[in-house]
Amino acid sequence: MKETQEELRQRIGHTAYQVTQNSATEHAFTGKYDDFFEEGIYVDIVSGEVLFSSLDKFQSGCGWPAFSKPIENRMVTNHQDHSHGMHRIEVRSRQADSHLGHVFNDGPVDAGGLRYCINSAALDFIPYDQMAKRGYGDYLSLFD
């Protein structure tokens, strides 16, 4: 049976629910993955779908976790966002359609020039040494 919205809210918490389901943004420099650089992968907190690797994470100083790319482009979708009087590109997870954050073209040039600015609340981190045990063994080769 599909999880209800209330069950989802209970499972992931209020902030993660607001971010992923209502396109909210957590306050800058408050997310647990902003200044966090352990080896592993980041998955959608709603569905567990694989999104980003620690290998592509960098310190941008923006106050949110920043990645140069998703593990695979097909794992995320991009959408025009004209909210708050700005023009941005929203990033959402493909499977769960969770709001993740935005992508900007001011990232490291040597890594493709993109900066995926992602809310910590939308992510769950899977440490390298737990990837196989938690069902993400197919992605261990990223770290070879």
UniProtKB/Swiss-Prot annotation:
CC annotations in GO: cytoplasm
Catalytic activity: L-methionyl-[protein] + [thioredoxin]-disulfide + H2O = L-methionyl-(R)-S-oxide-[protein] + [thioredoxin]-dithiol
Enzyme class: oxidoreductase
Assigned EC number: 1.8.4.12
Active site per the UniProt annotation: C117 (nucleophile)
Protein's UniProt keywords contain Transcription regulation: no
InterPro entries with a match to the protein in the record: Met_Sox_Rdtase_MsrB, Met_Sox_Rdtase_MsrB_dom, Mss4-like_sf
Gene3D superfamilies: Peptide methionine sulfoxide reductase
Domain MsrB: 5-128
Pfam families registered for this protein in UniProt: SelR
PROSITE patterns named in the record: MSRB
Keyword set includes Oxidoreductase: yes
GO molecular function, one term: peptide-methionine (R)-S-oxide reductase activity
Leader peptide range in chain numbering: none
Family statement drawn from the similarity comment of this UniProt entry: Belongs to the MsrB Met sulfoxide reductase family.
Annotated protein name in UniProt: Peptide methionine sulfoxide reductase MsrB
Organism whose genome encodes this protein: Streptococcus agalactiae serotype V (strain ATCC BAA-611 / 2603 V/R)
Gene: msrB
